[in-house]
């Protein structure tokens, strides 16, 4: 059943993962990227978020409101910056979020709000120096 709902959509992408696979090898890089995605999912859950899916080195989450998503995005950046295991490889994340009407169907989310959030993440510059 398809339901229309106002949601905040968040995408977080691991910046530098291509280089990581080249320098660390497939298994080590996949393990590290997986650890980062788990950390991001934990942060999302603390802010009332739900992980919709992971796509390679990216996580897609929904939140009940904009403030939940914004606080999660801030804490995600903080978590990556302050985790020594993630900083060994100078990793960062790019986060994009948008609030709007979305279609929820079989646990997945579709619509313009989703596309806008994905574009925001794509256009964001990863900051490793903050």
Model-based region annotation:
Residues 60-130:
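Catalytic beta-strand-to-alpha-helix segment of the class III nucleotidyl cyclase homology domain
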Residues 1-71, 79:
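Catalytic NTP-binding/metal-coordinating core of nucleotidyl cyclase/transferase enzymes
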């Amino acid at each position: 059943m398809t339901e229309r709902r106002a949601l905040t959509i968040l995408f977080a992408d691991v910046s530098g993962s291509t280089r990581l696979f080249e320098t660390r090898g497939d298994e080590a890089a996949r393990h590290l990227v997986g650890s980062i995605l788990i950390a991001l999912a934990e942060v999302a859950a603390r802010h009332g978020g739900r992980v919709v899916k992971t796509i390679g080195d990216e996580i897609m989450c929904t939140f009940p409101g904009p403030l939940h998503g914004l606080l999660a995005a801030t804490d995600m950046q903080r978590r990556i910056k302050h985790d020594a295991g993630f900083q060994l490889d100078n990793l960062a994340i790019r986060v994009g979020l948008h609030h709007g009407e979305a279609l929820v169907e079989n646990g997945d989310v579709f619509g313009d709000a989703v596309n806008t959030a994905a574009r925001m993440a794509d256009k964001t510059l990863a900051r490793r120096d903050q």
